[in-house]
């Protein structure tokens, strides 16, 4: 189950107690910065961790200028003056070398500190603590890292003269005594061994954020349901499904008992939008445990693949037809694994009618094997008769009354029975001679 599924009780509390949710969101918002995404780089990238021998060398070099100055005062030997100058020069080089390395962390380290700080506040709330009961111990284990990272001087706003003077003297101390270089080296020793715990905190904070977002998202929907598993005899079921991005979307219902779905109908009638609604609902069910329907039931572990809006590629030298051929080939390969939901729209538009119908029939028969479910739309009503034993047939249709074209967007059983494409051209003001010639051509082609 997804992380959302196992935390439905928390979602229920967030939905019923909006004041609590608002308070939690105020804490979450404190990490609402474009630099926050850079925290992920601390979890995966290779970091400039100094070797222990180099770290010990830094500890020795930080005392060379002071020791040289002391020995110069005691002995008055010019050699110790040269040693002090060389030591200061070496420390200066090492300081700026380390400072250059740390520029890559100018954004991520401050945001990591902010993440740890805000996560500690969230962990004090019983509801948030129930997201990850181990998080308190993890945060406690990161206190030493947090203190070490807090010593970073990753940059400072020089807003007035006093701050400028303070920064100048601090930078001198860091340059000559390697304070910053040593501190950052020790911090990255700690960081390298704490990445898994940092990732756990990152996931904790992110999951709390997601739960609040899902709670608000559900409230914005006209209605929703939780996904379920198919009842006996069912292979797929959805009741009153709608697309969340379509205002006043007309809902539709379909239940399958072993077959797939082939949808016919004219353009703009709702075929593609319905198929997209199925895909969006299944994705939301898997990721957010939220369905845009009164009820939504599908087989456990069902995976989604679609070929709805494909384009040619000039850069890759692929035509629309070749792009579609390669995509459908991948889907056929996936179909052998079984338990897939395939969504297809207008198969093989880039070839002639006879071969398009023949190829589409063969492909659609192949895809439904191994317990796969297919939702496909087509203008080729010939496919309905070829696939009637393997697919449940549905259609969308338009209404033409008094020269006005309208759609009800309701899914209806059976294949489409009327052809209104030429009628739509007439309504849209095409020249009458074009319309009449089209009607004549229909009669001729139907006799071929």
Regions found by a protein language model. Give the residues of each.
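Alpha-helical coupling/stalk and coiled-coil linker elements that connect catalytic or binding modules
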Residues: 1-266, 274-275, 279-303, 326-327
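ATPase nucleotide-binding head domains, primarily ABC-like/P-loop NTPase cores
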Residues: 79, 83, 94, 214, ...
């Amino acid at each position: 189950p997804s992380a959302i599924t196992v935390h439905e009780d928390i979602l229920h509390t967030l939905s019923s107690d909006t004041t609590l949710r608002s308070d939690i969101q105020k804490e979450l918002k404190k990490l609402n910065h474009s630099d926050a995404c850079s925290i992920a780089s601390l979890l995966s990238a290779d970091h400039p961790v100094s070797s222990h021998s180099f770290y010990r060398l830094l500890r020795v070099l930080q005392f060379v200028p002071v020791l040289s100055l002391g020995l110069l005062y005691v002995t008055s030997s010019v050699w110790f003056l040269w040693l002090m100058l060389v030591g200061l020069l070496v420390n200066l080089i090492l300081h700026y070398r380390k400072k250059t390395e740390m520029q890559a962390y100018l954004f991520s380290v401050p945001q990591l500190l902010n993440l740890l700080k805000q996560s500690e506040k969230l962990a004090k709330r019983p509801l948030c603590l129930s997201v990850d009961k181990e998080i308190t111990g993890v945060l406690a284990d990161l206190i030493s890292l947090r203190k070490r990272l807090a010593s970073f001087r990753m940059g400072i706003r020089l807003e007035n003269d006093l701050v400028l003077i303070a920064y100048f003297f601090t930078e001198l101390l860091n340059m000559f005594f390697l304070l910053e270089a040593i501190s950052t080296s020790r911090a990255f020793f700690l960081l390298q061994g704490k990445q898994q715990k940092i990732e756990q905190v990152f996931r904790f904070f992110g999951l709390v954020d997601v739960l609040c977002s899902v709670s608000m998202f559900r409230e914005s929907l006209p209605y929703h349901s939780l996904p379920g598993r198919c009842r006996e005899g069912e292979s797929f079921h959805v009741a009153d499904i709608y697309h969340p991005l379509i205002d006043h979307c007309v809902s539709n219902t379909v239940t399958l008992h072993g077959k797939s779905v082939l949808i016919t109908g004219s353009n703009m009638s709702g075929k593609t939008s319905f198929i997209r609604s199925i895909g969006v609902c299944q994705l939301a069910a898997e990721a957010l445990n939220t369905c845009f329907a009164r009820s939504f039931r599908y087989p456990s572990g069902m995976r989604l693949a679609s070929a709805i809006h494909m384009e040619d590629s000039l850069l890759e030298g692929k035509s629309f037809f070749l792009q579609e051929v390669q995509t459908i080939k991948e889907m056929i390969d996936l179909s052998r694994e079984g338990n897939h939901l395939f969504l297809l729209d207008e198969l093989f538009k880039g070839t002639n009618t006879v071969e398009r119908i023949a190829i589409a029939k063969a492909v659609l028969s192949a895809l439904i094997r191994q317990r796969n479910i297919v939702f496909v739309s087509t203008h080729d009503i010939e496919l309905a008769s070829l696939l009637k034993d393997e697919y449940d047939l549905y259609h969308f249709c338009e209404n033409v009354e008094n020269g006005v074209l309208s759609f009800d967007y309701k899914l209806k059983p059976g294949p489409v029975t009327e052809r209104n494409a030429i009628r739509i051209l007439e309504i849209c003001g095409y020249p009458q001679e074009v319309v009449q010639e089209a009607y004549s051509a229909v009669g001729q082609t139907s006799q071929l």
